[in-house]
Amino acid sequence: LYNWTSGGLFLRRAASGEQIDSLRLVENTNSSGQSAEELIRNEKCTAALDDSGTPTSLQSVSYSDTTWSLLFNCNSIFASTELRQALASAAVSAVEVPDGGLFAEAKGLIPDGLTVDGIDYRQAAGDVRPALGDPRSLYIAARDGGVSPADFGRISLLLPSGSGLSDAAEQINSAWQKEFSLFFSVEEVEPEEFQKRLESGDYTIALAPVQAEGGSVY
């Protein structure tokens, strides 16, 4: 960040070949409901954020720094690998990508559209989602390994409020009910409380964001 004024935010970086080394970000207050494509074509701005998911003839770059994932607290009944895999496998088969264009199906923890030394990471790494296997068979293996129905008391699926994933959480929970006859509650809390509970281990299952951090390949 180089400077900020009423005229916008000014960003700079070291010059490198033909790459852009300076940028001004301006809030558009006169868009009149125009799409990102219309803003670029009609107002001649260089780039605009697009959350519609609508195909366009303009060049686009997909961007995300967050992948939503199921986290299981292993200091609980979910110490069983087979049980975690059973629930994860059922969830993958059941959940639908939320509408609105803000979400896309994840192909791994690291989002699409990221490059490392100029190489497209996803294209180079491929689809790294594990092949978990049949959820019912995994659940039976967990039961054979000592998991008891009596151990499933007071389990909830925790997620932060305002995430836009309430329906997805309900879909996942319904799949667990249908596949395993397991009845968990869905618990939404404020983001601050959600983070505190994750850090303290005060959860059994969480639908949590894995986000970019400094020093990562993100």
Place the predicted regions along the sequence by residue.
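Pocket-flanking alpha-helical
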Residues: 34-39, 52-58, 192-218
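Stable alpha-helical elements in mature extracytoplasmic
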Residues: 32-36, 79, 83-96, 106, ...
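Ligand-site clamp/hinge motif
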Residues: 7, 12-55
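Ligand/substrate-recognition segments at binding pockets and active sites
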Residues: 6, 16, 140-212
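Sec-exported extracytoplasmic/periplasmic mature domains
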Residues: 41, 45, 77, 83, ...
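Short, solvent-exposed loop/beta-turn-alpha elements that line the ligand-binding surface or hinge
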Residues: 1-3, 56-65, 70-81, 116-134, ...
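A bilobed periplasmic-binding-protein/Venus flytrap-type ligand-binding module shared by bacterial periplasmic
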Residues: 12-14, 29, 61-86, 90, ...
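Structural transition elements
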Residues: 89, 101-144, 163-166
